[in-house]
């Protein structure tokens, strides 16, 4: 899937890009409902917004708390990708999308995962998929794969845009940049960057093998 994603970049994403929005809306709606379902089983998980618990954790389990920061940083780094797309959409649509859909869905799902672990402390691996009912597991896996591909595409597009801007500002030497759309200036393809990204991404996947190792 990863190699295929990079291989089709030169064709542009204009045609398939029309389904990205609806798919992501379904994705965020799904993870929000999954989280809410488990929150209702253990509503006390909402207390985790109180910073007292984080301070208490660091005070009594400093080593474990420090190691847990790795997972926390992995959660928040995805937010940095929003800035890469600022030139495509502008500040207002991104802010509205973040506060109106993305942030509430993520909070509900992470609370739901915490609530699930309260009732199933032995299921500490792949918590997200373990909290999905068995009959819905396959559709959610397919949906998660689609969401991952779309998120990866957003990052690739963002890197292409940043590279093009850096070339225009003479921060990078001139390299080949192809326009893949006759109507949208932002639809570009940078072959050198595309293949360097592919090698780096495949190397990371083979090296770490899981997000927990990362």
Predicted regions and their residues:
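The structured alpha-helical core of multi-pass membrane proteins
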Residues: 1-214
């Amino acid at each position: 899937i990863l190699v295929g994603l990079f291989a089709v970049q030169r064709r542009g994403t204009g045609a398939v890009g029309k389904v990205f929005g609806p798919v992501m809306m379904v994705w965020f709606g799904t993870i929000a409902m999954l989280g809410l379902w488990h929150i209702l089983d253990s509503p006390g998980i909402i207390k985790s917004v109180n910073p007292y618990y984080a301070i208490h954790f660091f005070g009594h389990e400093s080593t474990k708390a420090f190691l847990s920061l790795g997972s926390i940083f992995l959660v928040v780094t995805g937010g940095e990708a929003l800035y890469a797309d600022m030139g495509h959409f502008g500040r207002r649509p991104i802010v509205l999308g973040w506060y109106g859909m993305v942030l509430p869905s993520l909070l509900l799902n992470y609370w739901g995962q915490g609530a699930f672990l309260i009732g199933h402390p032995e299921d500490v691996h792949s918590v997200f998929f373990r909290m999905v009912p068995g009959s819905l597991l396959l559709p959610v896996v397919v949906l998660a794969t689609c969401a991952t591909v779309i998120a990866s595409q957003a990052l690739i597009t963002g890197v292409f845009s940043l590279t093009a801007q850096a070339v225009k500002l003479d921060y990078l030497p001139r390299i080949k940049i192809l326009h893949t759309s006759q109507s949208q200036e932002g639809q570009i393809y940078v072959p050198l960057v595309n293949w360097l990204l592919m090698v780096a991404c495949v190397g990371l996947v083979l090296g770490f093998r899981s997000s927990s190792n990362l």
